[in-house]
Regions:
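A detector of single, family-specific signature residues
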Residues: 1-342
Length: 342
C-alpha cells in the first residue's frame, strides 16, 4: 500500500502524518528533528512511502540531504505555496500542518524547490558571513561619523587611506571622545581583519572555478557577484530559458490582471536577496564606472535617459543575470560588441 508522509519541521521536534492513496490517516505523531530518528519512524510507519514532503526553512537543506543519503524519497515544498493551502484550515497547529502537507504531497498540488548542493550551500554560507561583516564594518564607521559630528568634527563621506587613521588624526590625545571611539575602532580593526580573511577565501574559490572566471568577464561583475551567481543558481539546466532567471531572482515586475484591469507593478523581489543586491551593484558599476564601450552599456545608457536611473539599473541587473546564465550554459565569455557607425 502506497503512503505519503508530511513533516512539519521545528527546531526540536517534527510532527509526522502518514496518509494512504485515498487520504486516510494511517499515523500521526512526533519525532525528534533528527534524520536518523525520522528515518526510523518512517520505515516503521510508512515502509512503502512514495513521497515525503516538508516546507522550505532553516533546517530544510540539511534535512533533505541527510534523508536523501538514507534513501528516502523526500521533496522540499515551496513554503509560500504550502502556506496558501494550509492557511484555509481553521486551527493552526503542528499536527494540522503535517496533515495538510501529507495531503498536498498525495494530490501533487505543490511546487518542489530544488535544494542546493552541499558545496554550493557551503559557499553560500561563506558569502553570507562576509556580507554580514561588511554590514557590521559599515555600521561601525557610520556610528563613529555620527559621534564626531555631534562635537562638530565633520568626517568626509569619501576618504583616502585607512578609516581608523583618519579618525585618530581628527581627535586630539586629550579629546573626550578619544577613549570612546577607541573601543569602536578596535572592533572595526578586528572586523576588517576577518573580512580580509573571507575575501581571500572568496578569491581562492573563484580562481579555482573556470565557470566563475568566465562570469567575471561581464563588466561590473566582480569576484563576489560571480561566485554568488554560480552557487545560488547551482544548476543552470533547471531553467527552461535564460529569460526565466530574472523572474527567479525577483527582478521582473508583478502582474495584476482582473477583468478590464491589467498592469505591471514593481519587481517581485522574490528569490535570493543577496544576489539581487550584488546584481544591482554590478549594474550601477557598469552604467557609471565602466569606461569601455559595450552593447550592454550603450543599451543601459539609452534606457537610463528614457526611464530614469533607478528603473534602468533594475533592467540592466536583469539583463546581466540573463547574460551570466548564457555564458555559463554556452561555455563562452562576454561579447563586448562593436560600436555602430552613426
Amino acid at each position: 500500500m502506497t503512503q505519503y508522509v508530511g513533516l512539519d519541521v521545528s527546531q526540536k521536534e517534527t510532527a509526522v502524518c502518514v496518509v494512504d492513496q485515498s487520504g486516510k490517516i494511517l499515523f500521526e505523531g512526533k519525532a525528534p528533528s533528527d534524520p536518523g530518528a525520522l528515518a526510523r519512524l518512517i520505515h516503521k510507519r510508512a515502509p512503502d512511502a512514495e513521497r515525503i514532503g516538508f516546507e522550505t526553512g532553516a533546517m530544510a537543506s540539511w534535512l533533505w540531504h541527510e534523508l536523501k543519503r538514507i534513501g528516502l524519497p523526500v521533496v522540499c515544498v515551496d513554503a509560500r505555496h504550502a502556506h496558501a493551502a494550509l492557511s484555509v484550515r481553521m486551527n493552526k497547529s503542528d499536527p494540522n500542518d503535517a496533515r495538510g502537507l501529507a495531503e498536498l504531497i498525495r494530490v501533487g498540488w505543490y511546487r518542489e524547490v530544488r535544494v542546493k548542493s552541499d558545496d554550493s550551500q557551503a559557499i553560500r554560507s561563506l558569502l553570507v558571513a562576509r556580507a554580514r561583516l561588511v554590514s557590521i564594518r559599515r555600521d561601525l564607521e557610520n556610528q563613529v561619523r555620527s559621534l564626531l559630528k555631534e562635537v562638530g568634527l565633520l568626517f568626509p563621506r569619501a576618504i583616502r587611506g585607512p578609516f581608523r587613521t583618519k579618525v585618530q588624526q581628527l581627535l586630539d590625545d586629550d579629546h573626550v571622545l578619544r577613549p570612546i571611539v577607541a573601543g569602536l575602532l578596535a572592533v572595526h580593526e578586528q572586523v576588517e581583519r576577518e573580512q580580509a580573511a573571507f575575501d581571500q577565501r572568496v578569491r581562492a574559490q573563484a580562481k579555482a572555478d573556470e565557470t566563475t572566471r568566465r562570469l567575471m568577464s561581464v563588466p561590473g561583475v566582480g569576484v563576489v557577484t560571480a561566485l554568488a551567481f554560480r552557487h545560488t543558481i547551482d544548476d543552470p539546466t533547471r531553467f527552461r530559458s535564460a529569460q526565466t532567471v530574472g523572474a527567479y531572482l525577483g527582478l521582473t515586475p508583478r502582474r495584476k490582471q482582473s477583468g478590464e484591469q491589467d498592469y505591471n507593478g514593481r519587481i517581485s523581489k522574490w528569490g535570493d536577496r543577496l544576489l539581487r543586491t550584488y546584481l544591482f551593484e554590478a549594474a550601477s558599476v557598469l552604467l557609471h564606472r565602466t569606461q569601455r564601450w559595450s552593447a550592454l552599456k550603450a543599451w543601459g545608457t539609452r534606457l537610463m535617459k528614457r526611464v530614469g536611473a533607478k528603473k534602468a539599473k533594475v533592467a540592466v541587473a536583469r539583463k546581466i543575470a540573463v547574460i551570466l546564465h548564457c555564458i555559463w550554459t554556452d561555455g563562452t565569455s562576454f561579447d563586448w560588441g562593436a560600436p555602430q557607425a552613426a
